[in-house]
Amino acid sequence: GVSFLYVKKELQENVHPLVISWGWESEKPGSSKFLDWHEWQGTRDMSAFLTVPAAVKFLKEHNWPEVSRKCRESVVTFRKKFIDHLNIESPCPDNWLGQMASIPLPVLDAVTFKKNLMETYHIQVPVFEWENKTYLRYSIQAYNSEDELTKLLSAVKELLS
């Protein structure tokens, strides 16, 4: 995988790397301290960096803001279905959501619930415990279908019945 980070010049001095490498206190610094700090972390195959322009072009050509909006809409719609089925209050307002949501589940054992989702329904999603509660987190990307969300909802309903 690859990612890129854009930071305005005037803010670059305030952004520090989470992991430091050879550029941190380089004996031969480059023209940009920001690049020295962030660009190179150890031995790396540089071919991933070369894919970034094509990825940005792909996002532009496929109207990614609209794709993202539709994904978020699906997250909100299905979260409402989860909340209605579980008869729980919404953990947060809809406008806090992006393309991901966490649903509190009335189960005590997150590991077993996750294992049952995978082994019985072939569904892989994060199920985790936080502050003595169990949560299921799902995210929607362009390649996800409504059928997959319906399958997840049905599986959760069956496991909780």
Task: Identify the residue ranges that each predicted region occupies.
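Active-site PLP attachment segment
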Residues: G1-E25
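PLP-dependent aminotransferase class I/II
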Residues: P17-K60
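Conserved PLP-binding catalytic core of the aspartate aminotransferase-like
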Residues: R72-V76, H85-T120
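A general structural signal for well-ordered alpha-helical segments in protein cores
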Residues: F49-V52, R79, A110, K114, ...
